[in-house]
Amino acid sequence: MRRIFPSFMAVLVGFIAFWLLLFIASNVAAAIVRPTPGTMTQAYTVSNLAAYALAAAGAGWMTAWRAPRERMRHVGALAFILALLAMAGMRNPVSGQPDWFPQALVALGPLGALLGGYLGSRRQAPGAPPAA
């Protein structure tokens, strides 16, 4: 059981990081774009997609950073969770969103997490000898 805990925590930290980063990025995007309540302009839609992708990439990086070993497997677990959440969101689309918006989130979440995880997994592990 003790061997599972660090892996579980790595994915949990990434998941929490995703929501925190998404909250921050979407609020910054809303402050910049200043959407009209109840509508999704093209600029607001693009800023939401960018915020989602950046949050997923940051979460993937955090998961890889916290993973005790096999970092990309942990990131893959996070990407799977993000895909499931986005698919669940497809069942109840928000009014005013383009029809393709939920499908874009299904793709952007896992891809962003995998990209961020790849970048995070390339870092040198603490205590490892320098690469030649």
Residue spans for each PLM region:
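Juxtamembrane/disordered regions of integral membrane proteins
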Residues: 1-132
